[in-house]
């Protein structure tokens, strides 16, 4: 079997988002992994049953550390000698693609997820664009996570190479048997959570899942929420993110508002999604947010901003609403409409939400698409060699 090396900056990506995908691919290829050593490192090897190589990689810009990472990745590539290497996340992309180019790995694939440079300005934006152009120059194949990411790569002229979105986008898909309102224990845990929050049948629970930082649109969310009727409640699932902290007024509202429930990080978000009446994601930028797929699989309608990724999952009037980013009045209006929606219309939207995810983003389908994608690339090598 052909050798395949998959790399990520941190093992948490392999432990959560890409979980079990390498194991599936190992049924068709000889798969090994490379990522930074951290608390989750040993879990990845155990979960996937595969060899995991230690290559420390630092998030952010650090020229000396990045050069050390490239040297260590070169050593891994010289030992593994893969026919194909695939990197996810920005720093792993830079380190892996440069090292793989130096080692002349035949097929070098990088997947771009959420792009940072479109929302940056000045010198920082120029530096980020230069890094992404370098990644593309070293790669043989470039995979945008979704059509929005593809459009940004093209409009900023990051590369002239062909860009291919796998399936309908996203890097992992979602297990719709696991993320299901009728999965064992979900209904009970959801009911218990509503009871713990003091919610009756007449209360409407909005749910946000993600890092609590300013780029997630929390300021607009809290402003919109405060204008809603007193039957509205808001559950925030996720930890405070100090890399881009929310403003003081928003943080104070999160901590003091009697109908805002900050539940912190949850290892299993199904109880929160099951307890909620609607998911809201007012982000300023995204790549292809997994939480939209998870909520949809749980038959939960969504209010999201009209940005990359979100507008590839949410179809207004079908499975949710789209609002402009940074627009609190528009967000408030959508939240009011959701609360006022007649039960039959809501039930139909819930059905649409789950059906859309099952049809386009089922995890097993995505794995099969990835396997076919890799096989096509490796077959092209064989034809060239003949």
Describe the function of each predicted region:
Residues 192-195, 337, 344-360, 366-372:
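A short, well-ordered alpha-helix in the C-terminal region of glycosyltransferases
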Residues 6-65, 152-154, 162-165, 240:
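N-terminal strand-loop element at the rim of the active site
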């Amino acid at each position: 079997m052909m050798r395949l090396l998959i790399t990520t900056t941190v093992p948490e990506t392999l432990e959560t988002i890409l979980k079990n995908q390498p194991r599936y691919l190992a049924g068709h290829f000889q798969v090994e992994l490379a990522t930074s050593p951290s608390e989750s490192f040993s879990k990845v090897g155990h979960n996937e049953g595969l060899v995991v190589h230690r290559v420390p990689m630092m998030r952010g810009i650090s020229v000396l550390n990045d050069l050390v990472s490239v040297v260590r990745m070169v050593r891994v590539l010289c030992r593994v000698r893969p026919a194909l290497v695939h990197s996810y996340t920005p720093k792993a992309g830079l380190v892996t693609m440069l090292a793989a180019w130096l080692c002349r790995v035949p097929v070098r694939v990088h997947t771009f997820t959420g792009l940072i440079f479109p929302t940056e300005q000045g010198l920082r934006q120029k530096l980020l664009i230069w890094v992404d152009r370098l990644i593309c120059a070293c790669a043989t194949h470039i995979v945008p996570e979704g059509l929005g990411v593809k459009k940004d790569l093209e409009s900023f002229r990051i590369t002239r190479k062909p860009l291919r979105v796998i399936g309908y986008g996203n890097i992992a898909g979602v297990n719709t048997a696991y993320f299901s309102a009728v999965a064992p224990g979900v209904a009970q845990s959801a009911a218990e959570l509503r009871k713990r929050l003091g919610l009756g049948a007449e209360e409407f629970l909005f749910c946000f899942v993600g890092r609590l930082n300013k780029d997630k649109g929390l300021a607009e969310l809290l402003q919109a929420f405060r204008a809603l009727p007193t039957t509205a409640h808001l559950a925030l699932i996720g930890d405070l993110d100090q890399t881009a902290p929310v403003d003081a007024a928003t943080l104070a509202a999160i901590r003091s508002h009697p109908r805002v429930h900050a539940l912190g990080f949850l290892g299993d978000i199904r109880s929160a999604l099951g307890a909620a009446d609607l998911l809201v994601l007012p982000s300023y930028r995204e790549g292809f947010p997994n939480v939209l797929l998870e909520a949809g699989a749980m038959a939960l309608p969504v209010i999201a901003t009209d940005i990359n990724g979100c507008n590839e999952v949410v179809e207004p009037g079908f499975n949710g609403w789209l609002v402009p980013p940074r627009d609190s009045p528009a967000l408030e209006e959508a939240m009011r409409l959701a609360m006022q929606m007649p039960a039959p219309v809501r039930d139909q939207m819930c059905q649409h939400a789950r059906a859309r995810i099952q049809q386009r983003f089922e995890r097993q389908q995505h794995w099969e698409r990835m396997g076919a994608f890799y096989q096509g690339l490796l077959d092209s090598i064989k034809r060239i060699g003949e």
